[in-house]
Amino acid sequence: MIKNFKDYLVEETKEVYFTFGRMNPPTIGHGKVMDALKSKARGADYRVYVSQSQDAKKNPLSYSDKIKHLRKMFPSHARQVMVDKKVRTAIEALVSLYNAGYRKINMVVGEDRIREFDTLLNKYNGVKARHGFYNFENINVISAGRRDPDAEGVEGMSASKMRGFAQNNNFQDFAQGLPSKVNNKDARKLFNDVRKGMGLKEETSFKRHIELPVVSETREQFIKGELFELGDSVVIKESEEIGIVSVLG
């Protein structure tokens, strides 16, 4: 008996690589993770998902602004930076990718988060829950070769350090955390978007940030308002006159 052509067809198992992060704001570290993601995919599909969380302290950028900045900063990955309001967590990313027909999945993350995600994602494989359902043949969590750039206290340039630079109005150091190809206009826009999300005013002068050396500990205490209390009596050294402290700092 002659078989039909369809009998010879073997359905190919679709495989995808992805990452998920806060990226608030995006940094050169996130770019390296995306480069690692593409490299490990070796021509297979890959996707970049970002958190939709927003707050003044750790997530100053809105979801839409973050997507815009990511696509501008990393044009070679722009098409892989996904906009999907239904994906708010890494687990929801798996649900979305499973519904898209993928059956093998690989998550690329900082090496310090491998165990966390490996446990979490495999725990719900084949389990119906509030987040939805997925049932992959394989779930692998792979190291991007470095620590998560979203982690607090990461060595080098991290999102937490970038937020600190924006809060302290230090554009010079903030710009050092961006890819060299990012132009000044886009860098300033990101800087001000972060400040705006923190409830701070927009910066227009972008003066160089200069840290002056400590002249004396006594002077530093005076500047910080730690040397005297309001109403204290002081003797002016040059004239020996007695004065009253009315302003601190």
Predicted segments, located by residue:
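Nucleotidyltransferase catalytic core that binds NTPs
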Residues: 2-233, 238-244, 249
